[in-house]
Amino acid sequence: WLDRVNGVTKEGGNIVSITMLSGKTYTGKMFIDATYEGDLMAAAGIDYHVGREGREVYGEEWNGVQTTVLHHRHHFGAVPKPISPYMIPGDPNSGVLPRISAEHPGNRHEGDKQVQAYCYRMCLTNDPKNRIPFSEPEGYDPGQYELLGRIYEAGWRETYDKFDPIPNHKTDTNNHGPMSTDNIGFNYAYPEASYKHRREILKEHQTYQKGWLWFHCTDPRVPKDIQEKFKTWGLPKDEFTDNDHWPHQIYVREAR
């Protein structure tokens, strides 16, 4: 792990050595930051940006906040019926449901510091001989998925649209839908966060996503046919064997 405060030594604008938190120092003629986070780049004083630049920065029409612009069916327009966002349906005074932000989304084309949501792209299998059934994660709270229950009650049925098949009865499973594996809004601090804070963010993402899996297996509001099919999936015994069969790397779609 790079010493992000004092770990970069430069001469004439060039990096000549880097020092890790362990105390080890590495010298070289060229250093390449090929990480998702760009910690070396930042520690070296290279200019960068986090979040969306406003349209006026570079004159790009698709920069900044894009309110009313909907993509990939990851939105509530894909749900057949309207859904109340409030704890007591129809009652704003009851407050919003968990995982819903009451903050203003911003004005179209304005910049902000928010980054695209992260998730763990999962390798799943429906091979009974190689499948580890999903289990209840520590800290599971079904109330965190109240919105998902209402989505199903409103008629949404696209659960398996991103269970993309790969060889050996496995999938590359990614986010799809208005409340899926992306942990929306809980990664905004990640690019600039300390190592400790990043670990906390990763843990929260794991808890959310494993809970999302368990909700599908157990909650009575999940349609019966979807739930029974969900129970045929699980983590492969022969993948990520040194990490409880869970992916090591979160899907950092963007950071610095």
Predicted regions and their residues:
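Flavin (FAD/FMN)-binding glycine-rich loop and adjacent Rossmann-like elements that form
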Residues: 1-2, 17, 24-30, 34-256
